[in-house]
């Protein structure tokens, strides 16, 4: 992998103080390598520059590690190429991850690469519409989506996959209104328990992670 990839990954992990050891970094590099290789045949990502991929796909997924410290299961909805689920599984081998997406070719990538890297990841080719039993999806300790960035759309769907005591996560790439986040959660019986705002260290792109739990 390009040296720029290693530099971007290391600087992002260190700048944000993320708990990612050397074994996890090696897995992340292998995942990124497979992602770029598959992307030549299957449309998985528009980001192909190694440094940008490291920051905007890997580091931006790994920012969830601190808020997942107590979780044993994770459901990643609209996962695409396994983001953020597969990078998180690289860093948390004890975390059981389910990645779902309506595009079968993307889930084929998730299944093949998770098997190759021996990651605790299951891929399910289904569009999540809020009916876990029919869709064959689990209720999880943590439920997240990068694909559904609009909380008004995401929260009503994602809340249906929460296990008892679970946390619903929204990864936001824009300015956020705390009152609006509180309101959309309250409509589903959820309380906003956290709103973490940060910048990606290289691009300075603004990001936020919102967290809700059931009242």
Swiss-Prot record:
Pfam families: GidB. S-adenosyl-L-methionine binds at residues 78, 83, 128-129, 146. The gene is rsmG. The keyword rRNA processing applies. NCBIfam families: rsmG_gidB. This is Ribosomal RNA small subunit methyltransferase G. CDD domains: AdoMet_MTases. InterPro entries: rRNA_ssu_MeTfrase_G (IPR003682), SAM-dependent_MTases_sf (IPR029063). It comes from Anaeromyxobacter sp. (strain K). GO terms for molecular function: rRNA (guanine-N7-)-methyltransferase activity. It catalyses: guanosine(527) in 16S rRNA + S-adenosyl-L-methionine = N(7)-methylguanosine(527) in 16S rRNA + S-adenosyl-L-homocysteine. It is found in: Cytoplasm. Specifically methylates the N7 position of guanine in position 527 of 16S rRNA. Gene3D superfamilies: Vaccinia Virus protein VP39. Its EC number is 2.1.1.170. One of its GO terms (cellular component) is cytosol. Belongs to the methyltransferase superfamily. RNA methyltransferase RsmG family. Keywords: Cytoplasm, Methyltransferase, rRNA processing, S-adenosyl-L-methionine, Transferase. Its main location: cytoplasm. Transmembrane segments: none annotated.
